[in-house]
Design a protein with these regions (language model features):
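PAPS-dependent sulfotransferase catalytic domain
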Residues: 1-161, 234-274
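PAPS/PAP-binding and catalytic site of the sulfotransferase fold
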Residues: 29-43, 161-186, 204-205, 220-221
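Short, surface-exposed acidic
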Residues: 47-52, 183-194, 204-205, 262-267
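Residue-identity detector for glutamine
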Residues: 57, 61, 177-180, 198, ...
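Short, solvent-exposed coil/turn elements at secondary-structure transition points
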Residues: 75, 103, 165, 198-201
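Short aromatic-enriched loop/helix-cap "lid" or pocket-rim segments at secondary-structure transitions
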Residues: 109-113, 120, 174-175, 204-208
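PAPS-dependent sulfotransferase catalytic core
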Residues: 193-255
Length: 274
């Protein structure tokens, strides 16, 4: 108990000392956004790299110019029950928050396979089925949706919402918007593409030599290999569509309509899959 309390105190201190905060539910791809921003800032400010994603070290090199970013775990929402998710975000008051979301069905599928294959340090190994998991009280689909809803328009907190899907469809464009939101000025436009190319999650094989991520930073969505003989090209565009039973998809769609506010910046209606 004391150890957990002291850990929360240290995190709170880091949030208070920071200029901007990166926040996401686990399995939303936050490491990718973090390292993309880190590569961009090393290029823009002409700083030495160090450990990829370590914003504190970048800030220490030039405190007068570099915004101090902190990647927050936001009280580990994947370990919470729905009624434990807090709407109150006053700890982030006065900060610029970058909130990353992802299609919740992909998030919950990815989280299930991570827990059922390897588990979490702070969670027990999950033995149930995917259909069981999405209906769990602790860290289930309802918890995820209520967490998303809590970040729709929190009082007195500035939030720039980024979707995982947009991040991968147009990483340079998303990076440009994020840098403007963070107040980074006089940017050479070519740096956005350069940062993308130096980030392994976006830049292909050449980027792997230009920027070395921390171990495990670029885990792909943890979905099992298909055993039905389908080729990659024949698989649905959304990974979750091949993981859930039709009843589960219908249930999750109803949950999304019930818990996500109408103004939540996400796809309220499903896109047709070709």
């Amino acid at each position: 108990m004391i150890k957990d309390f002291l850990s929360k105190v240290r995190v709170r201190r880091k949030v208070i000392d920071s200029h901007s905060i990166l926040v996401a539910f686990p399995r939303c791809g936050l490491a990718r956004l973090r390292d993309l921003l880190w590569n961009f800032m090393t290029l823009h400010y002409g700083l030495k790299g160090g450990r990829t994603g370590d914003f504190f070290q970048l800030w220490k090199q030039d405190k007068s110019r570099v915004p101090r970013l902190f990647v927050a775990n936001d009280d580990d929402p994947h370990t919470c029950f729905p009624d434990e998710i807090k709407d109150e975000k006053t700890i982030y008051e006065g900060k610029k928050v970058l909130f990353l979301s992802r299609d919740p069905r992909n998030v919950i599928a990815s989280l299930y396979y991570r827990r059922s294959r390897r588990g979490y340090i702070d969670s027990n190994y999950y033995w149930g089925t995917l259909s069981d998991f999405i209906r769990e009280g602790e860290g289930g689909f309802e918890t995820l949706l209520i967490y998303y809803a809590s970040w729709t328009a929190p009082e007195r907190v500035k939030v720039h919402h980024i979707s995982y899907e947009d991040l991968h469809a147009d990483p340079s464009g998303v990076l440009k918007q994020a840098s403007q939101y963070l107040g980074i000025k006089k940017v050479d436009a070519s740096l956005f593409d350069r940062a993308v190319n130096q980030t392994p999650a976006f830049g292909g094989k050449e980027a792997e030599q230009a920027s070395v991520p921390r171990q495990g930073a670029y885990l792909e969505p943890e979905l099992p290999d298909s055993d039905d003989g389908k080729t990659e090209e024949a698989l649905p565009g959304e990974p979750y569509l091949r993981e859930f039973e039709e009843d589960d998809l219908t249930w999750m769609r109803a949950q999304m309509d019930a818990f996500l506010p109408d103004d939540f910046p996400f796809y309220k209606q499903d896109n047709p899959v070709g």
